[in-house]
Amino acid sequence: KQVHNPKVLPLSMIFQDPMTSLNPLRTVGFHLREVLRRFQPKLTKEEREVAILEMLNKVGISNPELRLKQFPFEFSGGMRQRIMIAMALLTKPDMLIADEPTTALDVTIQAQILALLKELQEQLGLTVVIVSHDFSVIAGICDQVYVMRNGLVLEHAPVDTIFAQSLHPYTQSLLKAARLEASQGPVPADRDDSQLV
């Protein structure tokens, strides 16, 4: 019961693949209403609808009244990610954790999602933690970077320092591989145990 109490756990998470996080047999409206029923049970039905419509507008979903009646498969990948962001923010978290929030999105949609996260962070005063292997995402949105391997923090510094003067050999090897990949295409590397936040 405590897991659903925002006073106990004031954070929310956006998972990597919104299609697997959303029930394909339920409408988007059902998903959003369920979040409010669990996290803000004192709201009336009318107050829930107003909060949902406002949040959908805030995350850039046009025609929210119509969209509430649609199913996840009727949305593009970028729009599903916006729905996940709306669901996460309806819990009124202090911290938002986004696990690879731009995976499988084209470059234009990636930029839109990152800009949205940055804008919401500033508007709502959120702490946003981005878990990513993508150095362009890290460079574009992060202030601080934690380089992790096997669950251990190997290096922590401001983003500019990580890119210009990283100290740990593992960080340096990740950056070197990313530069090589950017210039020559994908480089085979075992990155399953590495995380950049």
Label for each model-derived stretch:
Residues A111-L124:
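Helical segment within the ABC ATPase nucleotide-binding domain
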Residues H4, S62-E65, P158-V197:
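Charged, flexible cofactor/metal-binding loops and thiol motifs
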